[in-house]
Amino acid sequence: MLSKEVVALLNEQINKEMYAANLYLSMSSWCYEHSFDGAGAFLFEHAREESDHARKLITYLNETDSKVELKEVKKPDNDFKSLLDVFEKTFEHEQSITASINNLVDFMLSSKDYSTFNFLQWYVSEQHEEEALFRGIVDKIKLISDNGNGLYMVDQYIKSLINK
């Protein structure tokens, strides 16, 4: 059985993962609205991955006979200035999730909850991949600036990242 503090922290992380899913759905819709269909499809798929992260946490809590407490998910932003703005905000959000996961890992280690510490290692690895992915997208968008042809090409590149 997990401690009450651990259960509370994991429930908070579920909420953060669900917020990320909703944020990426909002960003996906913005991309489709502005004819960035590749980026829209990519972010739509990424929203599914974020909800999978929440489900993985829910499963862990269920497997440990702990109480899952789903809370209200904050409304995500839906007003973006550009494709670069979308992906800069995505990258910033992933950095905040990484910080949250790192705090969880630190807490588990200091409280000697080695099972949950081990479980969270998947998230540590996942966040490393996420940050590298989104940093790369931001860098590519910055390379082409606001050039119409370049934006089309970067949209196609982003689409190619689905399921990689």
Task: Please name every model-derived segment.
Residues 1-164:
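Iron-associated oxidoreductase/ferritin-like identity signal
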